[in-house]
Amino acid sequence: MRRILTTVGLLLFAAAVLSALVYHSKPEQRAELARFHSPSLGDANAKVHIVEFFDPACGTCRDFYPFVKSLMDAHPGRIRLSLRYAPFHRGSGEVVKMLEAARRQGKYWPALEAILAAQPRWVVNHTARAELAWPALDGLGLDLGRVKADMGLPELAQIIRQDLEDAAKLGVDKTPEFFVNGRPMPRFGYEELKGLVDRALRDAYG
C-alpha cells in the first residue's frame, strides 16, 4: 500500500512539474508568435488573435488573405491579425522590405493588397522579382523614392531576421502557417482554420 501511495505521489509531483514547465513556457512562446514590430490589423483588444507567418511571393498566402479578412469581417472587433515574415522564396526578402518601407509612410495594408494582387506579374519561376513589383505601388500616394531609400535601412533587415528566427523556433518551414491564440492548425486548410477560429471565439466570447 505504501509503495502504491509513493508511486501515486511521484506521479502527481511529475504532473505538477510538467504543468509548471508548460505554464512558464507560454510567455516565451507568445513572444515568438507576435513581436512589437509585427504589422497588425483589427481591434487591439480583440480576444482572438491570428498570427500568420507568410511570404508575399507565396501563392497560397495570396489565396488565404481574403479568406482571413472575411473571418474578421464576420466577427467585427473580435479578431486581430498579426503578420510575420517567412520569405522562403528567393528574392522575397526585398519585397518584404518594400512593404515595410511603405509601412513607414502609413500605407502598409494598401501596399500589401496591391502587391498580392499583382503577384503573378512579379513572381517568375518561383522567384520573387522585386523590380517587377514596383508598378503595383503606383497610385497609393507613396513617395517611391523614399520607399527605395528606406528599403536599405538596417532595421528592416533585422525585422526579417527576427521573424525567420522565430519561425525556426516554432517549426515553421512553409507558408502560410497560422496560429490562433497560440494554437497551431492541426491540419492545413480553409475549414481547419475556420474551425480553430470558431473554437477560439467560443472560448473567448461564449
What are these regions (language model features)?
Residues 43, 52, 187:
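Conserved strand-loop elements at the edges of beta-sheets that form or border functional pockets
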Residues 46-138, 168-173, 198-206:
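Structural alpha/beta surface segment adjacent to cysteine/selenocysteine redox centers
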Residues 31-48, 73:
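A short beta-strand-turn-helix
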Residues 20-30:
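Hydrophobic single-pass membrane-insertion segments
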Residues 1-21, 135-206:
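C-terminal cap of thioredoxin/glutaredoxin-like
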